[in-house]
Curated annotation (Swiss-Prot):
Main location: cytoplasm
Summary of the function given for this chain in its UniProt record: Aldo-keto reductase that significantly contributes to cellular methylglyoxal detoxification by catalyzing the NADPH-dependent conversion of methylglyoxal to acetol.
Lineage: Bacteria, Pseudomonadati, Pseudomonadota, Gammaproteobacteria, Enterobacterales
InterPro entries assigned to the protein according to its UniProt record, in alphabetical order: AKR (IPR020471), Aldo/ket_reductase_CS (IPR018170), NADP_OxRdtase_dom (IPR023210), NADP_OxRdtase_dom_sf (IPR036812)
Alphabetic keyword roster: Cytoplasm, NADP, Oxidoreductase
Subcellular location(s) of the protein: Cytoplasm
Gene that encodes the chain: dkgA
Catalytic reaction equation(s): hydroxyacetone + NADP(+) = methylglyoxal + NADPH + H(+)
Family: Belongs to the aldo/keto reductase family.
Name the UniProt record assigns to this protein: Methylglyoxal reductase DkgA
Signal peptide: none
NCBIfam families xrefs: PRK11565.1 (NF008598)
Residues annotated as catalytic: Y51
A UniProt-annotated Pfam family: Aldo_ket_red
UniProt: NADP(+) binding residues: 187-241
Organism: Salmonella typhimurium (strain LT2 / SGSC1412 / ATCC 700720)
Amino acid sequence: MANPTIIRLQDGNVMPQLGLGVWKASNEEVIAAIHKALEVGYRSIDTATAYQNEEGVGKALKAASVAREELFITTKLWNDDQKRPREALQESLKKLQLDYLDLYLMHWPVPAIDHYVDAWKGMIALQKEGLVKSIGVCNFQIHHLQRLIDETGVTPVINQIELHPLMQQRQLHAWNATHKIQTESWSPLAQGGEGVFDQKVIRELADKYGKTPAQIVIRWHLDCGLVVIPKSVTPSRIAENFAVWDFRLDKDELGEIAKLDQGKRLGPDPDQFGG
């Protein structure tokens, strides 16, 4: 079995290409989920202030027998905290029981309140101080990203966006790549695979490779060069989602999955959300 792949970000830092997402997990659930994830080989955990489970993540990491330098921990600046990124980060670090973050992401642009450029400037300062190794954004459209770059000169290393076979965001993914921004997929299985796992091409590939539909979709993300963070609190699923290193999809198979794109957004519209 091949080793889990690592992605080098434009700032020189590296991160695992596959991590565990913990959206909707309670503080109790997340402890068991992370314990299982570390056991099967995950080293990247993606949480957020808005998930209200940073304390559980912190407890799980504290109890883990994995060295801190082997872990890649992400949390996110919530919309209400865009005017106070320093305080928000310090609160997150305290809950996570960490001295530094590997990746700090601005959760949404919230153009209605228009604080995202100033929030980004605050995040740049936090990176310079060493409190975070890398900084990026979530749910930013091209015009939001361009404004950050134009007004600060600092490009996010990550843009974490809704991305799955029904919502492939190829234009944004390509723009990110042109600007050396790594695209990361949230809701990578389209919220449990509805409308995806039952697609003929997904089922045929699952049969061909002896894999589950979820494993086929995760492998699609990996083979498209995306960082991917499937969410689960079920031990068997956590293990299943990581067992994707012993096969690859070929160019034609990736092309067939590309045909599933409907531009079907399951989450909020970044131009409208918040405020």
